[in-house]
Amino acid sequence: MGKESISLEREVPDLGSSSVKVLLISPEDVDLVWDEAEPLIDLALRHSEGELISSDLIPIIKSGEQQLWVAIEDSEVIASMVTEIISYPRKRILRVITIGGKDGRGIDKWYTFLPLIEGFALKHGCTSLEAWTRKGMVRKLNDWKNSYMVITKDLNQRMQ
C-alpha cells in the first residue's frame, strides 16, 4: 500500500458535551500516539491466541502495510484499531486486526465511524471488511455477516 499520509476525522456528538474524533495516523506519526494507543491494543490482544504482541505491529504500521486508527475524546485517546488491506486472488478486503478501548466505552464509539472506515476501504479498492472477533462483537455488528469461525488447537504440549 505504501506510505501515505491520510488524516480522516469525523466529529460525532457524544452523549455529554464532548465530541469524539477518529483519526487515521500516518506511518510517520505513529510514535506521536503509540504510548496512548498501545495499552488499548494490548487490551484487545488479551483475547488473542498469542499470534502477536503490540510491539510487533510498530514496524508493520510504520511501513504502511497496516494502518493505525485512534478515537480521541477530550484530547484523550479512548480507543485504537489496527487494519490491514488484504489482497485475495479474487477480492481485496480491509481486515480489522485489533480494536481496543478504555473501560469498554471506547469500542462502542467506533460504530458511528464505520462509514468512515468503509470509505477508506472503498478508496483503496476493497469490496468488504473482515474481522476475526468474539461473539459479543458479532452481536453489535448487526449489518455484518458471520461468514465462518476460526478455531484453534494448541500444539505446544506435543512439542515438549
Model-derived regions: residue spans:
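Conserved donor-binding loop and adjoining core beta-sheet/short helix segment
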Residues: E65-R105
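Acyl-donor binding region in acyl/amide transferases
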Residues: P89-N142
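Structural motif
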Residues: I61, E73, G119-A121
